[in-house]
Amino acid sequence: MELEQREGTMAAVGFEEFSAPPGSELALPPLFGGHILESELETEVEFVSGGLGDSGLRERDEEEEAARGRRRRQRELNRRKYQALGRRCREIEQVNERVLNRLHQVQRITRRLQQERRFLMRVLDSYGDDYRDSQFTIVLEDDGSQGTDVPTPGNAENEPPEKEGLSPSQRTTATLDPTSPAPGEGPSGRKRRRAPRVGASLTPELAPVQVGAEGWGQGVIKVEEDFGFEADEALDSSWVSREPDKLLPYPTLASPPFD
């Protein structure tokens, strides 16, 4: 009996020592009396109080954000600058292409005019024309503006006074000497008119100029347009047309081949 009571007492004591208090969960005792946990808590407190807490992280984040913003603005500025330079380069390339195309066009026109000039010179030389010794005046006018008539020393003394009210183009037509050839037949002429064939129908621009006896003596060719004649008015008997046999019978000339 005593042995049984002693065993029951030991069992009761051992159960109370290793059992958790009522109402609490079963937990193991802390190792080394809880010194490790206390040291960790003290270290954590020291880590927070060492200056690397929330304020330090916030300042560092703000600096990084500001640096990223500066880099982003610089990249955007560089992108816009490169785009503007690219557009300007494309515009310059287009202008250069247009200028080069215009130069090629002018070169083709110049080559064609040179071929025409050489062809006309050969034809006139074959007919024995003295176009190299002739003198004439070329009046250059801008489109839409009245050019000033500057007489050359060769024809300044031969200008009659009745031509002062004429336009430069009419004055040039009215001041030709009867012995000088038509405009465009000189050595520096760029375009030369061809004489019409005998018996061919003439347009108003190519019709022969009607000349009077007084006009030949004064070296003045009177044109019907300068006097303002009407179409139904009859001309004086002194105005006679040139005889067909006095016209130079230039045949029809074929154009030279062009490139």
Curated annotation (Swiss-Prot):
There is a cross-link at K222 (Glycyl lysine isopeptide (Lys-Gly) (interchain with G-Cter in SUMO2)). One of its GO terms (cellular component) is Ino80 complex. It is found in: Nucleus. The modification Phosphothreonine is found at T172, T203. Keywords: Apoptosis, DNA damage, DNA recombination, DNA repair, Isopeptide bond, Nucleus, Phosphoprotein, Transcription, Transcription regulation, Ubl conjugation. Residues 167-178 have a biased composition (Polar residues). InterPro entries: INO80F, TFPT. GO terms for biological process: apoptotic process; apoptotic signaling pathway; chromatin remodeling; DNA recombination; DNA repair; positive regulation of DNA repair; positive regulation of DNA-templated transcription; positive regulation of telomere maintenance in response to DNA damage. The modification Phosphoserine is found at S167, S180, S188, S255. It comes from the Eukaryota. GO terms for molecular function: DNA binding; protein kinase binding. Residues 50-72, 141-210 are annotated as: Disordered. Appears to promote apoptosis in a p53/TP53-independent manner. Interacts with NOL3; translocates NOL3 into the nucleus and negatively regulated TFPT-induced cell death. Component of the chromatin remodeling INO80 complex; specifically part of a complex module associated with the N-terminus of INO80. This is TCF3 fusion partner homolog. It comes from Mus musculus (Mouse).
